Amino acid sequence: MIPDVKYARSGDVAIAYQEVGSGPRDIVFLRGVTGDLVSTWEQPLLVRHVEGLAQLGRVLMLDRRGTGLSDRVREVPSLEVTMDDIRAVTDHAGSDEAVIWTGQAATGVASLYAATYPERVAGLVLLDPRARGTSSPRNSAISFVKACKV
């Protein structure tokens, strides 16, 4: 059964989220840039993943600002704005402390959230974290090598 969608206010923007499961531990399942609440329930492997997490506690999943059922925005949100959105959702859900579970592109914002609010983070699970952005020196070096080939 697909859980009801709730909305938390982060400034002037409504952030859509769902709660799955219950238990003593809250888990914020933060998807990367792509993915939304609606498509989550259309992907059997992802549903199994969420249901597995829900056996451990209450899972909070959100649509990032400008995606899915959350309000549209004109600009790409910064890590700090996205962090504030996570805080708005956890506050609205009554979560004082949670494990943050995420991967790839969302690991930066999860790490920033944990560093900013250590008292609110019980744990940090980072799957396939990205240590470099697209403008990293490594990418510059690769571009240079490719440009030198004749």
Predicted regions mapped to residue ranges:
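Short, hydrophobic/aromatic-rich segments at coil-to-beta transitions
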Residues: M1-K6
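Short beta-strand immediately N-terminal to the catalytic nucleophile in serine-hydrolase-like folds
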Residues: T82, I100-G103, L127
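Structural signature of beta-strand start/N-cap positions in the alpha/beta core
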Residues: R58, E97-V99, V121-G123
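Short aromatic-enriched loop/helix-cap "lid" or pocket-rim segments at secondary-structure transitions
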Residues: T40-E42, V73, S135-S140
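Gly/Ala-rich beta-loop-alpha elbow adjacent to hydrolase catalytic centers
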Residues: T102-A110
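Conserved HGGG/HGGXW glycine-rich cap/lid loop of the alpha/beta-hydrolase fold
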Residues: Y7-D71
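Conserved acidic catalytic loop of the alpha/beta-hydrolase fold
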Residues: E80-A98
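Flexible "cap/lid" loop of the alpha/beta hydrolase fold
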Residues: S111, A115-T116, R120-V150
